[in-house]
């Protein structure tokens, strides 16, 4: 159950945070954003979808998309839990999660990601362990 890429995008599709763990997929945040925006306001994009063999799992907050891409056909709930735990730890360290706070604290966020996910394999999920 490995993660190929993790990215945080603004609602406009700008890449704020991008980490390629396994280098087995070309940069896929553009593919993700085009497919999420394919849905209309009345329709909601599913939290998991597949494009050309790449699985995208994401959570949308008010202004941000936090997404994982993987080639594994593992449980989507597992990947959603990884995203939830990552968001929780980031919020514990920087407070409110907005595009501005991410840009101001991007070095810290990359350090958190590197502590929690090692070569695409989630390791730590508790704020106390990551500190």
Predicted regions and their residues:
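Acidic, low-complexity cytosolic segments
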Residues: 1-131
